[in-house]
């Protein structure tokens, strides 16, 4: 949407159409379409101050419509065609839009006559075009600015939009000018520390970002990988601001605030939009958990320090609010936001930001493997939730199942049940921002004003936290002063009273209150104020720990590092409390080779997770003539498998989609041994021969598995499905102790074959040595390097 203002000269649409009718006989259809649509856009611009974007020749189920302005579809013919032709075609397009979930009205026009068609296809009015101008004007004012589909929203708020490009450019300039400002610098460091776990800034992605930046006006400089990283950061800042405003718009529509528009919500007397953006948790208390602090709100700190950027950001937020006020978020599904994100960026840029939307077909495959039927007794968690696809599908199934009951529970009870059972966790703050909005959209019909008022504050249990991080209890002599150590990427290490001894929520609230709003913090005064707000018993037992905590946060405050990171610490506790509690853990953990993740995170994974620490099939490495060091190049997903098992209660089920390489790779030896000897393997679906679209425009070769946390029962069999190269499924059952290649070695790769084939293979093994045991015949792996772009050739032809 172009935000250029209308001229002062009044536009008479009726007269415009009258003049156009005089020339219509001599115009081509393309010229007539252009002049007609331009006249309508000029009228809307004059009446509202905003110029609606037209979408020409938009593809629908029944062909291509000539044009669309918001919620109005146009079919335009020249005068030599009867109007009925345009009416018939327009009705066909409306039917196509309806089947896509888009409700619109139609306008049929042939240069002389006009017909207005309702959402159901009924003809509301027909006559001379100029005579229908008044009714057409009313429809234009009502529908021309409406946002009706994701592609339309991309045009308004994505790269085609001047508004988006200007906002993103100003964010980047503000960041580069103020990157040493306390919170700004730390926000980028925290984001950078977790960025590599969700995305990979390849050379292809850097080049795509450079090309995109060059198309800005004026062009933005992205000259190297570091500047490309900054560009990705501000893109996520822009999108996170949009997500906050989406939720605020939903709150307006559901009457959770007194204001009737988002623009009014951001413009109360005596306040500025940038300031209100930071206050949304307070302004909309019923949805406060959605507005948790994250690394993306640094633009508010820049606005406090720089009036020029404050004015620019206020203007951009105001323009965004005007557009979002035309969006019906009550009727919007999770799929709307997914498609908006997918169409916002080119594939290389989307991969640079991170692929967060798992394809729903594979999600359903995982849930089916777990036996999830829309009911759950206990907690269901996705510890790598990304944008929340698993959570959304689970919520949808829970609601559908409940609605089918003879006596379904009241909405308020169902809402509390879902938010108490369905939990998401992710390390990437942008993914979490998307997941919270998607969680809200999935609850959809349950979010009525009446229901929300009945439950009070709605808690969305989607946590920004490192699900692999464990709370560390140091060895101490005095049990009474038991403490825990929390490590946060890029922030450091914090020692806290044990969460079973002290309520962390109260501790963090007291700490925030003890710190001054402005100016320099005196550690002694902070310590004194903190102790005043806590019980005497706690102060006496944890005096040394509290003194150190007060000193740490006072020092952070004096370096402009404030207490906004406390949620990260609190969320770690939320994850830790899931240990041994979950009935079902599902998800799609990141597939990243361990050497590609941030070094400190890599070291922690090796130190903390046995599946990684003891990785490397020793016998296999010997047979292949390679070192176990190479065999220990684990996939990051292996650590999440181990963590998922920790969070399960006895009898709980872990169901994930992971790389199919864990069936054979040397690095997955400890994992395979644990599954075969200590779990009941329920289901294996092997796509290693058949590419599967895990993400939009991205294919992989995954394995879907489901295991129960219980001692294996030899009487039970594992259901295995192999998918061949043309997508055909072959399902069979076998005892899980028949999976290992070597019957006496549960660490060995799995034989993904039916029992008859395995029996034949075992017969071949009897009394016969392995080639790897015969030195002269041992297969060799060859030279292994990390120089994947270099090739050794014998001769290059001239």
List where the protein language model places each region.
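Acidic-basic catalytic patches of nuclease active cores, encompassing PD-(D/E)XK
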Residues: 9-54
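Metal-dependent nuclease catalytic cores in nucleic-acid-processing enzymes
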Residues: 37-42, 89-106, 438-445, 637-647
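Short, basic/polar, glycine-containing "phosphate-handling" surface segments that engage DNA
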Residues: 2-26, 58-59, 63, 77-87, ...
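Signature of N6-adenine DNA methyltransferases within the class I
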Residues: 59-62, 113-158, 361-362, 392, ...
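Class I S-adenosyl-L-methionine
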Residues: 41-46, 50, 176-178, 184-217, ...
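Conserved acidic residues
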Residues: 71, 104, 378, 583, ...
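Class I S-adenosyl-L-methionine-dependent methyltransferase module
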Residues: 377-381, 392-572, 598-599, 604, ...
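Active-site beta-strand-loop-beta-strand hairpin of nuclease catalytic cores
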Residues: 65-74
């Amino acid at each position: 949407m172009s935000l250029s203002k209308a001229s002062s000269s009044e536009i008479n649409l009726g007269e415009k159409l009258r003049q156009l009718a005089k020339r219509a006989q001599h115009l081509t259809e393309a010229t007539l379409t252009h002049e007609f649509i331009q006249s309508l856009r000029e009228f809307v611009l004059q009446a509202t101050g905003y110029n609606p974007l037209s979408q020409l020749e938009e593809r629908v189920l029944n062909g291509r419509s000539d044009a669309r302005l918001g919620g109005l579809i146009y079919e335009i013919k020249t005068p030599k065609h009867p109007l009925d032709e345009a009416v018939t075609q327009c009705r066909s397009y409306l039917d196509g839009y309806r089947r896509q979930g888009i409700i619109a009205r139609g306008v049929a026009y042939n240069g002389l006559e006009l017909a207005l068609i309702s959402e159901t296809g009924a003809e509301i009015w027909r006559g001379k075009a100029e005579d229908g101008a008044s009714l057409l004007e009313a429809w234009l004012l009502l529908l021309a600015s409406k946002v009706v589909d994701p592609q339309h929203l991309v045009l308004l708020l994505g790269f085609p939009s001047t508004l988006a490009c200007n906002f993103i450019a100003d964010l980047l300039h503000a960041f580069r000018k103020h990157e040493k400002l306390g919170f700004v610098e730390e926000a980028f460091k925290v984001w950078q520390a977790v960025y590599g776990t969700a995305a990979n800034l390849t050379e292809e992605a850097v080049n795509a970002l450079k090309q995109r930046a060059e198309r800005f006006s004026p062009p933005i400089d992205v000259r190297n990988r570091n500047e490309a990283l900054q560009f990705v950061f501000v893109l996520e800042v822009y999108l996170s601001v949009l997500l906050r405003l989406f939720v605020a718009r939903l709150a307006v529509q559901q009457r959770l605030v007194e204001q009737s528009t988002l623009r009014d919500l951001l413009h109360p007397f005596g306040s500025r939009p940038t300031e209100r953006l930071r206050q949304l948790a307070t302004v909309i208390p019923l949805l406060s958990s959605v507005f948790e602090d994250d690394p993306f709100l640094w633009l508010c700190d820049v606005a406090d320090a720089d009036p020029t950027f404050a004015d620019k950001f206020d203007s951009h937020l105001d323009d965004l609010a005007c557009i979002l006020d035309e969006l019906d978020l009550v009727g919007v599904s999770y799929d709307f936001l997914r498609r908006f994100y997918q169409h916002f960026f080119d594939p290389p840029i989307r991969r640079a930001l991170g692929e967060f939307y798992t394809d729903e077909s594979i999600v359903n495959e995982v849930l089916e493997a777990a036996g999830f039927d829309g009911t759950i007794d206990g907690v269901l968690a996705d510890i790598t939730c990304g944008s929340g696809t698993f959570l959304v599908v689970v919520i949808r199934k829970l609601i559908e199942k409940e609605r089918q009951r003879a006596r379904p529970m009241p909405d308020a009870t169902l809402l509390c049940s879902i938010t108490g059972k369905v939990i998401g966790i992710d390390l990437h703050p942008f993914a979490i921002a998307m997941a919270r909005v998607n969680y809200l959209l999935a609850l959809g019909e349950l979010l009525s004003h009446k229901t929300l008022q009945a439950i009070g504050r709605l808690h969305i249990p989607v946590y920004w936290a490192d699900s692999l991080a464990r709370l560390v209890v140091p060895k101490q002599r005095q049990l009474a002063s038991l403490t825990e150590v929390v490590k946060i990427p890029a922030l450091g290490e914090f020692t806290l009273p044990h969460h079973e001894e002290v309520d962390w929520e109260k501790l963090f609230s007291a700490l925030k209150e003890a710190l001054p709003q402005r100016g320099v913090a005196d550690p002694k005064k902070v310590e004194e104020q903190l102790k005043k707000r806590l019980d005497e018993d706690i102060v006496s037992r944890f005096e040394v720990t509290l003194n150190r905590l007060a000193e740490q946060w006072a020092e952070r405050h004096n370096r402009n590092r404030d207490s906004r990171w406390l949620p990260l610490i609190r969320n770690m506790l939320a994850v830790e409390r899931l240990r041994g509690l979950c009935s079902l853990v599902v998800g799609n953990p990141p597939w990243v080779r361990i050497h590609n993740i941030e070094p400190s995170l890599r070291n922690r994974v090796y130190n903390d997770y046995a599946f990684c620490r003891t990785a490397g099939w020793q016998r296999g490495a010997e047979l292949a003539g390679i070192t176990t060091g190479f065999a220990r190049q684990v996939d990051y997903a292996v650590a999440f498998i181990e963590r998922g098992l920790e969070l399960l209660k006895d009898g709980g089920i872990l169901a994930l989609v992971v790389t199919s390489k864990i069936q054979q790779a040397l690095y997955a030896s400890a994992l395979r041994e644990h599954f075969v000897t200590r779990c009941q393997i329920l289901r294996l679906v092997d796509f290693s021969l058949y590419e599967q679209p895990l993400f939009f425009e991205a294919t992989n070769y995954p394995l879907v598995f489901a295991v129960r946390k219980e001692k294996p029962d030899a009487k039970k069999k594992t259901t295995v499905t192999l998918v061949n190269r043309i997508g055909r499924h072959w399902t069979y059952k076998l005892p899980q102790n028949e999976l290992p290649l070597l019957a006496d070695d549960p660490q060995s790769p799995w034989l993904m074959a039916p029992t008859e084939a395995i029996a034949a293979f075992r017969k071949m093994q009897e009394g016969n040595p392995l080639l790897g045991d015969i030195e002269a015949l041992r297969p060799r792996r060859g030279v292994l390097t990390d120089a994947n772009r270099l090739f050794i050739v014998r001769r290059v032809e001239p």
